[in-house]
């Protein structure tokens, strides 16, 4: 399967790129050999399917009819942010100014290595065919979005038989907007699609896909007392190992931590990364759990205000579900950021909030939260509402896998009967108050999410932000 993808990419490259440098052709053997580490990169690396699929078919249960489909997706693979890029460049500066021969796992730097960030303008941006470091790279955000669109049509294309004109909603980050546009391109020209760019600025208040941006009450340091307990001596060990192999290098534990991000973003930009081979399997596990902890206690159920933040969008999706019989549109497609999806899944109860993650050790048996499983680059969450005979059901499909609601999954395909789902959802949002908890009034007077209902008259076209 993967070879066919590589060959198709190669064919496209030959048509569109003219002469491919021989060095890049030599690298094709490395592409696709590192996919086993994607789940350990904290959602910074390329897309992969949810590993815990429980063996449940994602096909519509036999004899059922889809009534409404909602999608909430993350932007595709990207270059690092400005801040993360600056950190990676500092480590690269140390390495590039080392005057001796590299040894051990850094020896690849002796072979005319080219740093993957070739242009500062690429920071914050989607990786594309045009800005990728390797014309054979199958992991660009552009290709991911287009491939997702074709897979979407294969799975749900029948939903468009009587609906060829519809909106797609995107947060106003440039990379989110670009992902939505590549997805539109992948759907093909048989559709008349209106791309609605919805503000993610603080002033947008509740009328946004990115409620966290309008939440001045949110404090990323709120649970540092927990996070600081996590043992990060493995980073010291990495730095010591590399320094021992390369006398006078003087890498720090911060450099070691940065190398994990370097690995992930280079995969997005190049299709492979020799930096990824620096780490042992144990080190990847420890890094991955550290990323899980940070997300759980900053953007997930470990932070008590997140359920209220996610309720802003979750309540809107509930309203759409309840209006499915009266709404002309049957498919609702939205693109945003990973934190927004984590907030949403926290409110929905898909991420376990009964047991907080421990920072004392890596809980192999008890950990059900893996950040990268939920929000790899290009993540997608589908809410399916379907009817079987006279009964209606709801279920979630996350990154190609059906993920049942544990306490409500007795319906066909492990779905939740609609009235039971509404009861469940009511309990999930009980006590939440996005406007109050976030102190939204201090930054905006917008108190309601309306873009799903007024897009046709408002025509959202907000200024794109490079963030």
Swiss-Prot record:
One of its GO terms (biological process) is phosphate-containing compound metabolic process. Its EC number is 3.1.3.2. The active site is at 75 (nucleophile), 338 (proton donor). It catalyses: a phosphate monoester + H2O = an alcohol + phosphate. Glycans are attached at residues 97, 103, 162, 192, 250, 315, 356, 390, 439, 445, 456, 461. Residues 1-17 form the signal peptide. GO terms for cellular component: cell wall-bounded periplasmic space; endoplasmic reticulum; fungal-type cell wall. The keyword Cell inner membrane does not apply. It holds the Pfam family His_Phos_2. Keywords: Glycoprotein, Hydrolase, Signal. The keyword Hydrolase applies. It comes from the Eukaryota. One of its GO terms (molecular function) is acid phosphatase activity. Present with 952 molecules/cell in log phase SD medium. Belongs to the histidine acid phosphatase family. This is Constitutive acid phosphatase. It comes from Saccharomyces cerevisiae (strain ATCC 204508 / S288c). The lineage of its organism: Eukaryota, Fungi, Dikarya, Ascomycota, Saccharomycotina. The gene is PHO3.
